[in-house]
Amino acid sequence: MVAAAAAIAVQSPAASTPRGARPAASQVKLFDGSSLSAWRGYKSDAPPAGWRIAGGALTKDGSVGDLVSRDEFGDFDLELEWKIGEAGNSGVFYRGTEEYDHIYWSAPEYQLLDDIKAADNKTRLTCAGADYAVYPSPAGHLKPVGQWNRARIVARGPHVEHWLNGFKLLEYEIGSADWTARVKASKFAAYPNYGKAARGHIGLQGDHPGSLAFRNIRIKALQ
């Protein structure tokens, strides 16, 4: 890992306003508890088999294909609730394109993880809330397996923030010297357009085994 300044961890209340926030459009529901109309598969018009709606939540058990939003987003404020099973591993991608075989080759990822038992818990670079393999998240804000956690991703231009349960975990600047060095030191160095799209799809990772649920997925375009 590059010896660079760690991402800033700030314990901030949920009501705090992200840097540079301005009046914006109303939130749009990407999942309303009853329909997958806002979603499809990666490079596919239909949602992958294995995702289902149960009790107002979007769920899966076992390894399935990734979901991507039908719409693309540039500057946005995304909020969702997630619940993961024991040893579970997943993620939320943002500004993803479909130029590569997999969305994670182009899109930054907000990591979703069981930090206690998942194999990826060996480093904070891959624990819950991290910008996967690029910026670490601080410990202490994740609710246990079986409980709902609340994730928030705020992206305005190159500035990105990751929030968990009302606490800002990290922030970074795409294209900065620090970001560039970290990406170069990661597995994403093989993909020259990783993280560089100004707008793209939201993605929900399904290709790891185990149970996973989402609910109350809402996004607001920032102006």
Predicted regions: what they are:
Residues 1-9:
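Bacterial N-terminal signal peptides
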